[in-house]
Design a protein with these regions (language model features):
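Ligand-binding clefts of soluble mixed alpha/beta catalytic domains
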Residues: 1-395
Length: 395
């Protein structure tokens, strides 16, 4: 339904935030018409500058709809709303005075109590490892290159101190606790280099059964301790094949999805490289409502990678052509594959997702630590989380 994430939903959230006690102030410094007129009026406080307009329909539409001729000021001007309708709380002469009024109003709010986990905030310490190294360590090609994830974490957390959980088990996911801007946090990150587990090599960026088990337990531990979780994505998905199925990848993957879905502590997600398919979901992707979802400029974000998607779509289209009697030759298939791949690659670009609000912000690597700390600052103002309930777990 086209309104699902548009104005109707915005109005709904306006009202819900008010019910939660979140202060909302608005300043009208221009024209607010139709749906845009409801937003400021649903706020706690409304400031309006002289010469601005606020109406459900402008003068031209009013004349067309009911034949009434009226000036903009008489219909919905600032003075009219201040003196006649009583809609405006504060009338100001210009933008500068309106902004100053907002500052004074904001200063009058009592400080909000912080969430329990935020009361344990300590003095922030810069990472011991140089943050400037991040640009050289992080992927520049959407996550296909291997790298040591611990080196990334060391350049984000306070003092580069990271207390790893089950470090020698399920090693394609790195879990542990640290401090970020003084706040206690849990971290779940995809390991991008090849690791050895029980004598066998495991591909970086892939979630194996044991890693899913470990991460599910760690997410529950963070909820038990009441601390936020930061997810660092660079994931191709869950491992497939005979060995993986016999290891219970579906059951154990479902356990991780369950734990993340029902987690009640704040979750922040960052797409460092690629984030694809069910791996994206398990790492607290957009559908799992993280408080913030950031991405680096080189990030890639889709159901699957470009090559795999193009091959799948090509197979479907080739089968359709064959059924219609038009058996394609190799050159035709190659041309079709390249056209599909190029189109899919454009959609993989993080700017494509950002333009559709699939991520909250595209962040430069050197700004990532600060963005995460600011996000935690915002999360700290939230109320205490409800009790954790996870339903039935596959064991």
């Amino acid at each position: 339904f086209p309104d699902q994430d548009d104005f109707g939903r915005v109005f709904y959230l306006n009202a819900r935030m008010s019910a939660l006690g979140i202060p909302q102030m608005a300043a009208i410094m221009g024209n607010c018409v139709a749906g845009g007129a409801y937003l400021p009026v649903m706020c706690d406080t409304l400031v309006m500058t002289e010469g601005s307009g606020l109406y459900l329909a402008g003068p031209a539409l009013v004349k067309a709809a009911i034949g009434q001729t009226v000036s903009s000021e008489d219909l919905g001007g600032a003075v009219m709303h201040a003196e006649v309708s009583g809609t405006v709380d504060y009338l100001e002469p210009d933008d500068a005075h309106a902004l100053e009024r907002l500052r004074r109003l904001a200063a009058g709010y009592a400080p909000r109590p912080v969430a329990g986990w935020a009361r344990d905030r300590r003095e922030s310490v810069e990472p011991a490892q140089k943050a400037e190294d991040l640009e050289g360590l992080l992927p520049v090609d959407g996550g296909s290159q291997p790298y040591e994830t611990h080196e990334i974490i060391a350049r984000l957390v306070d003092g580069s101190a990271f207390d790893e959980y089950k470090a020698r088990y399920g090693r394609t996911l790195v879990c542990g606790t640290a401090r970020l801007g003084g706040f206690p946090v849990g971290i779940v990150a995809n390991q991008k280099r090849v690791v050895k587990n029980r004598g066998r090599l495991e591909v970086g960026g892939v979630i194996y059964a044991e890693a899913a088990d470990k991460a599910a337990r760690f997410v529950l531990n963070c909820n038990q301790a009441g601390i936020p979780i930061v997810f660092l994505h660079d994931v191709n998905g869950f491992m497939v094949g005979v060995d993986s199925e016999q290891d219970g990848i579906i059951r154990r993957g479902a356990k991780l999805v369950n734990a993340v879905s029902n987690s009640v502590v704040p979750r922040l997600s960052v797409i460092l490289g690629g984030s694809y398919g069910a791996g994206h979901y398990a790492m607290s992707g957009k559908a799992y409502a993280p408080r913030f979802l950031f991405a680096l400029p080189s990030a890639r974000y889709a159901v699957m990678g470009g090559q795999q998607a193009a091959r799948t779509i090509l197979d479907i289209q080739a089968a359709q052509l064959a059924r219609s009697g038009a058996e394609p030759d190799e050159d035709t298939l190659a041309e079709l594959f390249e056209r599909i791949r190029a189109g899919y690659e454009r959609a993989l670009d993080i700017r494509y997702g950002a333009a559709r609000l699939w991520v909250d912000e595209v962040v430069m690597p050197l700004e990532l630590r600060l963005r995460l700390i600011r996000a935690l600052d915002a999360c700290a103002l939230d109320s205490e989380p409800p009790p954790l309930k996870v339903g039935v777990f596959q064991v």
